[in-house]
Amino acid sequence: MRKKIILTGGGTAGHVMVNVALIPKLKELGWDIVYIGSHQGIEREIIGRIDGVPYYSVSTGKLRRYFDWKNFKDPFNVLKGVWQAYRLIQKEKPDVVFSKGGFVSVPVILGAWLNGVPSVIHESDLTPGLANKIAMPFATKICLTFPETKQYVNADKAVYVGAVVRDELKDGNAEQGRKMCQFDGKKPVLLAMGGSLGSKKINDALRANLSTLLAEFDIIHICGKGNIDPSLAGQKGYKQFEYVNEELPHLLALADIVVSRAGANAIFELLSLRKPMLLIPLSKAASRGDQIANARSFEKAGYAEVLMEEDLTNESLQAAIHRLYENKDRYQKNMEKAGASDPLQTLLAIIQDTARL
């Protein structure tokens, strides 16, 4: 009899990409797959491009670190989402639920618990996010990317897995990436990206330095939806993308160095590809500090240069990029020491074992 799994997670691409990595492996094993996400989250677009995975949406809310009248309404949206998820899980009868986090995952994990269906949560960041904190007491297993995270969760449920990276990222072709960007190959390539939603601060600082940086680098700029600068279209050596999907492996293969936010999925993908990285984590004022912890961990391991957002200026960005490029060989040697493991297979084994409970 075929096994069935419900996957959930969304809000940002980071809460979806582990699921994207799991889907082909689960299909190879003969699993039926269903996805539960939000009505309008980025997960709907990403999963919608994958054949054979039905998508259902439920109501959800979010945590805002500022006053908003929606903060009073959202708890009721979450309760509505729990009821919707409960009914969907009752109908689909999965053997197990897997969550990658994000606020849409809370109703789904609660719905699984109410139905007596075992669930597995994957926490990417060093410190757990609020959605996972709420959901963890109701989960069967908690898979960790950083071993240090064990101190923040129920140790009896916790399993260190490591970072799950999509196989296709390793299949990039630098020459194909060069053709996409129409670069001539005479300069090293700098790739800058601010996460799936983009980063105005990184975008502004990079563009303010553009003429200086273009003297030394060809630049790929993944700037986020709605953040293309039309005045820079056609600028030699500078290629803008709002968001990339199939193109990303080729662009990463082409890049010599990368400027990035410090979301866990992104930085572990860069680590797996041995890409020297300048990390600019979201500030404490704009987040719960998870990216700062991630960045400091990579800095301590010698994998990354770190520039705090509070210290981000046109001058500091330019100086940090130069330091990164000058020391790229050292960073790559440190990353080689990270060794090889297969977190995806470990995670699959945990999911299969949990489904048998």
Swiss-Prot record:
Residues involved in UDP-N-acetyl-alpha-D-glucosamine binding: 12-14, 166, 196, 291
GO molecular function, one term: undecaprenyldiphospho-muramoylpentapeptide beta-N-acetylglucosaminyltransferase activity
GO biological process: carbohydrate metabolic process; cell division; cell wall organization; lipid glycosylation; peptidoglycan biosynthetic process; regulation of cell shape
InterPro entries tied to this protein: GlcNAc_MurG, Glyco_trans_28_C, GlycoTrans_28_N
Main location: membrane
Enzyme Commission number: 2.4.1.227
Compartments where found: Cell membrane
Identification of the protein by name: UDP-N-acetylglucosamine--N-acetylmuramyl-(pentapeptide) pyrophosphoryl-undecaprenol N-acetylglucosamine transferase
Catalytic activity: di-trans,octa-cis-undecaprenyl diphospho-N-acetyl-alpha-D-muramoyl-L-alanyl-D-glutamyl-meso-2,6-diaminopimeloyl-D-alanyl-D-alanine + UDP-N-acetyl-alpha-D-glucosamine = di-trans,octa-cis-undecaprenyl diphospho-[N-acetyl-alpha-D-glucosaminyl-(1->4)]-N-acetyl-alpha-D-muramoyl-L-alanyl-D-glutamyl-meso-2,6-diaminopimeloyl-D-alanyl-D-alanine + UDP + H(+)
UniProt keyword terms in alphabetical order: Cell cycle, Cell division, Cell membrane, Cell shape, Cell wall biogenesis/degradation, Glycosyltransferase, Membrane, Peptidoglycan synthesis, Transferase
Gene3D superfamilies: Glycogen Phosphorylase B (3.40.50.2000)
Similarity comment: Belongs to the glycosyltransferase 28 family. MurG subfamily.
Top-level taxon of origin: Bacteria
Function: Cell wall formation. Catalyzes the transfer of a GlcNAc subunit on undecaprenyl-pyrophosphoryl-MurNAc-pentapeptide (lipid intermediate I) to form undecaprenyl-pyrophosphoryl-MurNAc-(pentapeptide)GlcNAc (lipid intermediate II).
Membrane topology recorded in Swiss-Prot or TrEMBL: Peripheral membrane protein
GO CC field: plasma membrane
Protein's pathway: Cell wall biogenesis; peptidoglycan biosynthesis
EC main group: transferase
